[in-house]
Design a protein with these regions (language model features):
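N-terminal pro-sequences and low-complexity stem/linker regions of secreted or lumenal proteins
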Residues: 1-258
Length: 258
């Protein structure tokens, strides 16, 4: 109950509900937080912030939650937008180190500090990214952001530009044998940008590594836009994507048991 607005389930009772994105910038996040009172969410982000899903809407996710331990105390690292939180995911901070200023917007300027893949290399821990390359993982291709082609933007392949380490200069123009080259690993199911919905070729590399027992010690999976559950895409796309990942992992009982 916030600002006289009660929680509300979506009108369409299934996971194909498409919600528009709410404000998720630094200013609105801190306004909703309100110095720890957390009482200004509706005022800062509209009444839609009170929406929620039930087991009827997202049955697959509820089934997973009932079958497995789920870390449900999940919070973002920064009360701010997407890229600073992805910088936390892959570097442990959003700047303010190595001479870089703190990032509180979606810019990736001046990203020059040490990333987690580099720390894993130094510790002798293997790692790999599983993603689709879209039309390419270089700067000119948007680092794998959803491709453009045909009649307009397509969202079924690429990685939505969400592999943020690729914005660091040292990850660009990597040679094949470079220790950071696993950041460029990925399928490329349609380099021309004519994506096909629900294409299981997205999981070929993960399936092969599971089957061959060659999974790295740390794996990062970066989904295309349509399956990321980022507004305005539906939860059903994320459920399909997660189910294919679990199908790949459980296909090898020895790997699954580990």
């Amino acid at each position: 109950f916030q600002s006289w607005a009660r929680p509300a389930a979506p009108a369409t009772r299934n996971s194909d509900t498409y919600f528009a994105g709410l404000a998720h910038d630094w200013n609105s996040g801190h306004a909703a937080w309100h110095n720890g009172l957390h009482d200004s969410w509706v005022a800062a982000k509209s009444q839609q912030t009170m929406a929620y899903f039930t087991s009827q809407d997202i049955p697959y996710y509820y089934a997973l939650a009932q079958a497995f331990t789920v870390c449900d105390g999940y919070h973002c690292s920064q009360l701010g937008p997407t890229n600073p939180n992805r910088l936390y995911l892959w570097t442990g901070c959003c700047g303010n180190v190595a001479g870089a200023t703190p990032h509180i917007d979606n810019g990736t300027y001046g990203a020059n500090w040490t990333t987690l893949p580099e720390r894993l290399n130094a510790a002798g821990v293997s790692w790999k990214f599983y993603q689709d390359r879209g039309q390419g993982l270089d700067h000119g291709s948007g680092f794998g952001e959803y491709p453009t082609g045909g009649g307009g933007d397509l969202w079924w392949n690429g990685n939505y530009g969400d592999n943020t380490v690729l914005n660091f200069a040292r990850y660009q123009n990597l040679a094949a044998g470079d220790p950071l080259a696993p950041a460029l690993n990925g399928t490329q199911i349609d380099p021309k940008g004519n994506g096909t919905p629900y294409d299981t070729r997205l999981f070929q590399q993960l399936q092969a590594d599971v089957a061959n027992g060659t999974l790295p010690q740390v794996s990062w999976i970066v989904a295309p836009y349509a399956y990321s559950e980022h507004p305005s895409w539906a939860t059903s796309g994320g459920e399909w994507y997660v189910s294919n990942i679990l199908d790949a992992l459980t296909a090898n009982p020895e790997v699954w048991a580990s």
